[in-house]
């Protein structure tokens, strides 16, 4: 370990990563298949988007998902606009989804 490098706590490191992700991936368009979809009583939706090469967790908060017009189901092909974020307490990278539509519907 280099002596000139500061020793970070896990929380400090996660916050730094979260900040970097938020700056670098402020807006992304992503397509994929919905899996593990769950709508909670709070109104928030939690799901994963996946393709043949990987998957990423997603959250869509109530204020945004009220504008979607349909309830996604596992297996749906969708396109989302989102920002990349990290849930700092667990170190999980996720998409915070701002809009969602069925894939191939145009815009």
What do the predicted segments below correspond to?
Residues 1-107:
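Acidic, two-metal ion nucleic-acid-processing modules in DNA metabolism proteins
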């Amino acid at each position: 370990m280099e002596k000139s490098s500061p020793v970070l706590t896990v929380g400090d490191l996660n916050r730094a990563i979260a900040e970097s992700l938020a700056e670098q991936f402020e807006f992304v368009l992503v397509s994929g298949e919905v899996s593990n979809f769950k709508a909670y009583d709070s109104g928030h939706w939690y799901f994963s988007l996946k393709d043949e090469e990987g998957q990423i967790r997603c959250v869509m908060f109530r204020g945004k998902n009220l504008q979607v017009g349909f309830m996604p189901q596992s297996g749906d092909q969708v396109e989302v606009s989102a920002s990349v974020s990290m849930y700092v307490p667990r170190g999980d990278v996720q998409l915070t989804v701002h809009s969602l539509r069925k894939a191939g519907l145009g815009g």
